[in-house]
Amino acid sequence: MIVDNFRLQLGGKEYVPIVVGGMGVNISTTELALAVERLGGIGHISDAEVGYVCDKIFSTNYTSRKRKKYAVYIDNPDKSRVLFDLEEIAEAQKRYIDYTVSQKTGNGAIFLNCMEKLTMNSATETLKVRLAAAMDAGIDGLTLAAGLNLRSLDLIQDHPRFHDVRIGIIISSVRALAIFLKRAIRLDRLPDYIIVEGPLAGGHLGFGPLDWQRFDLKTSAKDRKSVV
C-alpha cells in the first residue's frame, strides 16, 4: 500500500514535501524550479550574479557594461570603488523572476535563494534592492541564506508584501537562529519556515572539516526546533 498523506503547510497553502534548493549562477535553473513547481513542491532559483544569468537567457549586456565601466580596476587588488549598479540589479532581478514565475503551471511555488553576502561595497543598499525587486516581481517566497541576516527583515518591513510573501532562513547554528528570531519577533514577522543545514550540506556553514562525524541532521533539527 502506498501512503501519500504528508503535506507541507506554509501560509495556509499546502505543498508536496519536495523542496529543491537554489544553487547560484543558474546552476539551479528556471527549468528545474518549474519542474518541482509542477509537481506541487517548492523550487528555488538564485539571484547570484543575476545580471550574468540575464545575459545568458535574454542576451542582455549587464556584465559587459559593468566590466567596461570598471576596467581600470581589473588588475587592481583594491576594489573599494567597484559597485553594483542598483538600478540594473533591480531591473535584472525583476526580469529573471518574472520570466520564471510567469511560467508556473502547477500548484507549487517558486522561491528565491537570496544570499546575504552577495554585495559589492554597498551591502545594505544592495541587499534591500535585491529583496524588494524580488517581491515586486511576484516571487512566492524568500529563503534568506549565507549569513546571519540580522537586518534583512528590517530592510523590507515597509514593503507591501512583507506579510504576504513567504519568508524563511537557512540556519546551521542554534545561536544564530535565536538571534534571528529575536529580531523577527521585534518586527512581528516570524519566519514561515526554517531550513536546517548540517556539516554535509556544503556552502556557507559554520562547521569544521571533521564535524560531519559529530553531527547528524535529525539531532540538529531537534535542537533548532527547541529554540522555536
What are these regions (language model features)?
Residues V227:
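Conserved small/polar residues in nucleotide/adenosyl-binding loops
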